[in-house]
Amino acid sequence: MTNIKVEPYLPDEDYDNPAMVTDFYEFSMANCLFMHGYKDTVMVFNMFYRDNPDDLGYAISCGQDKLVKFLLNYHFTDRDLKYLLYKGMSEEFCEYLRTYKWKGNLYALREGTVCYPQVPMVRIECDMVGAILIETYLLQTMNFHSLIATKATKISGLSTHTPRSVMEFGTRRAQGASAGNDGAYAAILGGCIGTANCLAEMKFGPDVPAVGTVAHSFIEFFPTEMDAFRAYAESYPTHVSLLLDTYNIFESGLPNVIKLDDELIAKYPNDPNKRVKSVRIDSGDLARGSKKLRKALDAVGKNYIKIVASNSLDENKMADMERYEGARIDSYGVGEKLITSATDPVFGGVYKLVAVKKEDGTYEPKMKCSDSVSKAIIPGKLMAWRVFDSEGKGQCDIISLDNEEFKDGDIANLINLDPDAFDPVVKVECTHVERILVPHIINGELVIDLPDIRAKKDYIKEQLENRVWESELRPQMPHKHYVDLTPAVADCREEMYRKLHGGRIK
């Protein structure tokens, strides 16, 4: 490294540049390779994961749009360079970063695509600096968004074809503001109808609507519960939704809400929109309470008042209340169990070097070895395909070399990636086949139209309803989706493993 005098770096806790959301060793590696003359060497990395969260049969890939915007705006500031000099990076490297723009290629699954273990979700091909330095942000973005979108499909009932109305209420329990915002976005894609987070709607628009009514503190502030109800109805006569369990649901909350609704009917007899829209319960036996509330409200002709429930709910509690207890709940507010994916809080996506472009334009495969077959990397510049059967459902995914092609009607001879498969050699009829790893950025330029949030939400719903086998959607012991390698990929993997490890993949 160049021996120069560096002034101490002055911290600034308000400073923010996403390009610096990077593990320090990324800079250490990139600086070293730069100093050894590899700045123009093109590397290929794949981002994939090894296990579905919550032992599911699938996951939802999410975060691609945020990643695209990050790469298109990738840059370093003088403050960044001063810090990197302070941390020991070379002056030449920092000067190179001063004008650096990301000019690589990004191939990825479309945001919202159902995905499976080992199949590449993202493929990066870029010069050394642009391939290495983006790893941390890429993984943070893709892992968290995919985790929450997947969890939301369970909580919203999309995955079991039993959709329920769910609002994302987890902002205050999220691990920081960015998790609250990104989590709200991913939850909406996964089937939620709204979020408690105002900034999320400001950032992403009306398809991520902020919703909510009152807290217990609002009710407690007034001399009586009825005073609180009346004040709220006076302020928002077309959006009256009230919390019933501040004092006593059935001795206080219910009688008062019935009385208030009668007052609204008397005051606005010709405006049916000015009525109590819903009531929420946040404690006690929610299933039993909802049934009792429904019966009482229906008995006085108020079947239009919806019942909302919240209180540390998740997909299992909701399903049990619906299936075994006959709960009469119209909508749910779900907080920490969704925004943290509490039952499985880590999406294990990894970012691995799989090829380096040589001077003659060909690609040299790269592979990390492991005694565990599940961690033996699939080397080479790869492409991902999905084969659909005659019913339009995903039959298997194929991992091929980038220059291999498949078309409808092909008979593909493949190698089953599952090490426990009885017969590793399979023959697949490609009734319909789609290339699922598609270009998003080429040579630093956006080459794909990014759909809006509603379109992505509908895309996820359509896949889970029509393009995924029900056996893969089972909550317990789901069918394992078939992932196959082309013989060329399998041979490359075997040859690399034998060369580096001295034996066959076991």
Question: What does each model-found stretch correspond to?
Answer:
Residues 2-41, 51-53, 88, 92-106, ...:
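Buried, small/hydrophobic-residue-enriched core segments of structured protein domains
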Residues 2-41, 45, 50, 54-59, ...:
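Gly/Ser/Thr/Ala-enriched C-terminal appendages of enzymes
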Residues 36-99:
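N-terminal, Lys/Arg-enriched amphipathic/low-complexity engagement segments
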Residues 277, 305-306:
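Short active-site oxyanion
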Residues 82-83, 150-154, 170, 472-478:
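Short coil/turn segments at secondary-structure boundaries
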Residues 63-66, 147, 452, 456:
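Short amphipathic alpha-helical segments
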